[in-house]
UniProtKB/Swiss-Prot annotation:
Binds 1 [4Fe-4S] cluster per subunit. [4Fe-4S] cluster binds at C438, C504, C507. Its cofactor is [4Fe-4S] cluster. GO terms for molecular function: 2-methylisocitrate dehydratase activity; 4 iron, 4 sulfur cluster binding; aconitate hydratase activity; metal ion binding. Isomerase involved in the biosynthesis of phosphinothricin tripeptide (PTT), also known as bialaphos (BA), a natural-product antibiotic and potent herbicide. Probably catalyzes the isomerization of phosphinomethylmalate to phosphinomethylisomalate. Shows no standard aconitase activity with citrate as a substrate and is not able to complement an acnA mutant. Belongs to the aconitase/IPM isomerase family. The aconitase AcnA cannot substitute for the function of Pmi, despite the high similarity of the two proteins. One of its GO terms (biological process) is tricarboxylic acid cycle. Disruption phenotype: Disruption mutant loses the ability to produce PTT, but it shows normal growth behavior and is able to form aerial mycelium and to sporulate. Disruption of the gene does not affect aconitase activity. It catalyses: phosphinomethylmalate = phosphinomethylisomalate; phosphinomethylmalate = 2-(phosphinatomethylidene)butanedioate + H2O; 2-(phosphinatomethylidene)butanedioate + H2O = phosphinomethylisomalate. This is Phosphinomethylmalate isomerase. Its EC number is 4.2.1.166.
Length: 894
């Protein structure tokens, strides 16, 4: 049975199965509007989910009742629970490599319990893009790319050997080699089809392209009308094995776009403004669908930039409709005309083609309006993406923000730059300027604007500030090709923005070290140093450990701030520097207008560029091709590896789950505040030499220069466990004012490290809980932020609210996500974190899904809301997580 379309035994209860002709070819479809006429008033995203149910109907798991429930969806009624079979899965390596290690370990357990190894294999197409590993160590030189690539391969050889084994062993798995591109840009420019033409059956089939990805920014592909969202690596393993995702149909918010952006306003400005407004409005967990006359003012690349930051405004998906602009983008990126014909014919037949006249009849939960003409040039920072600052008020806003960072005491630092020049820097000194991230480098208009601005700056004689580390890491080689064709790459080079990698780099914290002369001066003085990047996240401590304030900006503004060298400036009125003629040069003097950008794009951006580049997408360089790629049914673990170790999730796993018990005598490991990110819980950046993980690696004989990052070592649980809650910016109320990975061991009263306390609790058989405020687990879809706590004995997290993916990850690891009663938190309830916690009602999961459980902590008792949202999630809790549940299900069906 193929994945996309069922066999002849499909019940087809609604008579949806049909055949359409496109250009003389016949294709099977499940005709949506004929089978379910009410689908015409559903939001586009729910139409896609409805087609998915019709196509996967089996009469048992996907039955007619699910179809009826979704077809009758009431925007203001209870949310029906449905199943969803994504057409494919995409992964980046930081989360994808652990998924493959989990699959390898699960396969071993499967064989141990009597299954056949080959049965446990991917059942849907999986593309893993290696983009998270490379670091921008070398910069500002013509050979920076080559040297960083060599360092990356040397550091990650073991991980890459595992990928080569997996690609050779597992069917349906493709690996996009390192330094080729960024997952979401590769997905946008090549992998996404909008409509899938599946020729694996006797009759070719057409159905919507849908995707889940092990990265929270997977919704970027929503810009092409492809429904998809981010999931944790834990949930992804089940999806890879063909298990449907279970979900409650979310709120769907219609966002009407009106007006046109003013000249000089970029897609980055639009998405930062939209992020601010939608985050304030409250769209957490919702699907957003964009419509309205303003769509005509946005290119598909602009739409993708907006969809990329969907997690930052809190939504699950941010869907743009399929229309002529989507076809134009597919053509511009080298997709064949035959496929464009299929996309149009299928979308029009199924009611998935955008119909402006019908927008008013769609059943949305609510509608909001966003005027593109209201957007002004902006940046966001210094700590959250939603903290937008209009460019005209940045100096004032910075003064307010820096006073919080430095406690009202201004700092200065004497710095010797890499070129030997000496400078006195003040708070706000820009020490890192990074054109990075698929969010913006996927957008030709933004990258061309940066190149044109650089050209004008060079022509007027502006020089780069020598203390600024400047990097350029686009999401695909197509970017450098069209910049070179336009002659703009040389100007970026002259300002220090030389190519360092094709990978995420600074956006995920792989900025590489600052020059030691700069970093040392910053550390010694306590200077409030600044990074400006074209990424999508600027959480505290994320970008570089020696940077205290992070601002998001468009690529041309990144170049501008690198020229200014400081955030303590009003770019709308003050000069960036002095030109070769001795006159001041302002931002207005070098800012390109839209006509210039469009003219360059017309001549430099060519479909052939994309076709040529992506034809060799899976090839890799000589180092990659030289790695062994021998298929073996079971992975050959190396006992002395410090990168890859068999995970302990399946140790002692039995064919049937053990009964659940209530939680008794639990102690609080951490008492945290609001907006605790997955970076706080499980860092991804460099491993400090003095940290518990660093000490552990040194004891194994690994020199500090080879520590690599937490993200790269995510397949060694011993390293990652020692890194839990060790972010230097973490604030734990139990840590007596110390930041970082410290807590109180309640058994002894001693202040100690998180890891040492967790070990002591485990040895004493004491379960753990974590207390938190709002938005616990925000940020990256980092499965280790749930895996780690589960392995050290955390049984429950009690918070005011949870970020969507992290809540799902907690459930996926068997940890209970519990919410305080509405309007309450640890402080209002009088909790100190020193209490012993009993949680009653957990054993009810054996029979049902309890809505609340009783929490007793000392003299305080309250009913916590159980955020186990579906019956299937309750099964995960019963089984101790999604992976044991999936393993047992495969054993039963084998």
């Amino acid at each position: 049975m193929r994945h996309g379309s069922q066999n002849s035994e499909h019940p087809d209860s609604f008579g949806a199965r049909d055949v359409i002709e496109v250009a003389g070819e016949s294709f099977e479809i499940f005709r949506l509007l004929n089978a379910v006429p009410s689908a015409g008033s559903l939001p586009y995203s729910l139409r896609i989910l409805l087609e998915n149910l019709l196509r996967h109907e089996d009469g048992v798991h996907v039955h007619a009742g699910l179809v009826d429930a979704l077809a009758a969806w009431d925007p203001r009624g209870p949310a029906p629970e449905i199943l969803f079979h994504p057409a494919r899965v995409v992964m980046q390596d930081y989360s994808g490599v652990p998924c493959l290690v989990d699959l390898a370990a699960m396969r071993e357990a499967f064989v141990r319990l009597g299954g056949a190894a080959e049965t446990l294999s991917p059942q849907v197409p999986v593309d893993l893009v290696v983009d998270h590993s490379v670091m921008a160590d070398v910069f500002g030189t013509p050979d920076a790319y080559a040297r960083n690539a060599a360092l990356d391969h040397a550091r990650n050889r073991e991980r890459y050997e595992l990928l080569r084994w997996a690609e050779a062993t597992f069917d349906r798995l493709r690996i996009v080699p390192p330094n080729t591109g960024i997952i979401h840009q590769v997905n946008l420019e090549r992998l996404a089809g909008v409509v899938i033409a599946d020729d694996t059956g006797s009759l070719p089939a057409l159905y919507p392209d849908t995707v889940v990805g092990t990265d929270s920014h997977t919704p970027m592909v929503n810009g092409l009308g492809v429904l998809g969202w981010g999931v944790g690596g834990i949930e992804a393993v089940a999806a890879v094995l063909g298990r449907p995702l279970t979900l409650r149909v979310p709120k769907v918010i219609g966002c009407e776009l009106t007006g046109r952006p003013a000249d000089g306003v970029t897609a980055t400005d639009i998405v930062l403004t939209l992020t601010e407004r939608l985050r304030a409005h409250g769209v957490v967990g919702a699907y957003i669908e964009f419509n309205g006359p303003g769509l005509a003012a946005l290119s598909a690349a602009d739409r993708a930039t907006i969809a990329n930051m969907c997690p930052e405004y809190g939504a699950t998906a941010a869907l743009f409709p399929v229309d002529d602009e989507v076809l134009r983008y597919l053509r511009a990126t080298g997709r064949p005309e035959r496929h464009l014909d299929l996309v149009r014919a299928y979308a029009e037949t199924q009611g998935l083609w955008y119909d402006p006249a019908a927008a008013a009849t769609i059943r949305y939960t609510e509608r909001v309006r966003f005027d593109l003409a209201s957007v002004v040039p902006s940046i966001a920072g210094p700590r959250r993406p939603q903290d937008r600052v209009p460019l005209a008020t940045t100096r004032t806003a910075f003064a307010e923000a820096v006073s919080e960072v430095n406690g009202g005491t201004a700092r200065r630092a004497e710095v010797t730059a890499p070129d030997g020049s000496r400078h006195t820097l003040g708070d706000g000194a820009v020490v890192l300027a990074a054109i990075t991230s698929c969010t913006n480098t996927s957008n030709p208009a933004l990258m061309i604007a940066a190149g044109l601005l650089a050209r004008k700056a060079v022509e007027l004689g502006l020089q780069p500030r020598p203390w600024v580390k400047s990097t350029l890491a686009p999401g695909s080689a197509a970017v450098m090709e069209y910049l070179a064709r336009a002659g703009l790459d040389t100007y970026l080079d002259k300002l220090g923005f030389s190519l360092v990698a094709y990978g995420c780099t600074s956006c995920i914290g792989n900025s590489g070290p600052l020059p030691e002369s700069v970093a040392g001066a910053v550390r010694e003085s306590g200077l409030a140093s600044v990074a400006v990047l074209s990424g999508n996240r600027n959480f505290e401590g994320r970008i570089n450990p020696d940077v205290r304030m992070n601002y998001l900006a468009s690529p041309p503004l990144v170049v501008a701030y690198a020229l200014a060298g400081t955030m303590d400036i009003d770019l709308t009125t003050e000069p960036l520097g002095t030109g070769s003629d001795g006159r001041p040069v302002t931002l207005a003097d070098i800012w390109p207008d839209s006509r210039e950008i469009d003219e360059v794009a017309r001549t430099a951006v060519d479909p052939g560029t994309y076709t040529q580049m992506y034809d060799s997408l899976m090839a890799g360089d000589e180092r990659w091709r030289a790695l062994p790629a021998h298929p073996q049914q079971l992975f050959p673990w190396a006992e002395d590896s410090t990168y890859i170790a068999p995970p302990p999730y399946f140790v002692g796993t039995t064919a049937r789950p053990r009964p659940l018990d209530d939680i008794r005598g639990a102690r609080v490991l951490a008492d945290l505040g609001d907006s605790v990110t997955t970076d706080h819980i499980s860092p991804a950046g460099g491993i400090p030499a003095h940290s518990a993980a660093g000490v552990f690696l040194r004891e194994l004989g690994v020199p500090p220069g080879d520590f690599n990052s937490y993200g790269a070592r995510r397949c060694n649980h011993e390293v990652l466990l020692r890194g839990l809650f060790s972010n230097p910016r973490l604030r734990n109320r139990l840590a007596a004012g110390k930041t970082g990975g410290h807590t109180v061991n309640h058994l002894t009263g001693e202040l100690t490290t998180m890891y040492e306390a967790a070990v002591a609790y485990q040895e004493a058989g004491v379960p753990l809980v974590v207390l938190a405020g709002r938005e616990y687990g925000t940020g990256s879809s980092r499965d280790w932020a749930a895996k780690g706590p589960a392995l050290i004995g955390v049984r429950a997290v009690i918070a005011e609210s949870f970020e969507r993916i992290h809540r799902s990850n907690l459930v996926g690891m068997g940890i209970l996500p519990l919410e305080f009663p509405a309007g309450q938190n640890a402080r209002t309830l009088g909790l100190t974190g020193a209490e012993e916690f009993d949680i009653s009602g957990v054993r009810e999961f054996s029979e049902s899904v309890p809505r609340t459980v009783r929490v007793t902590a000392g003299a305080v008792s309250f009913d916590a809301v159980v955020r186990v949202d579906t019956a299937m999630e309750a099964e995960f809790i019963r089984h101790g997580g999604i992976m044991p549940f999936t393993l047992r299900g495969l054993l039963e069906s084998a």
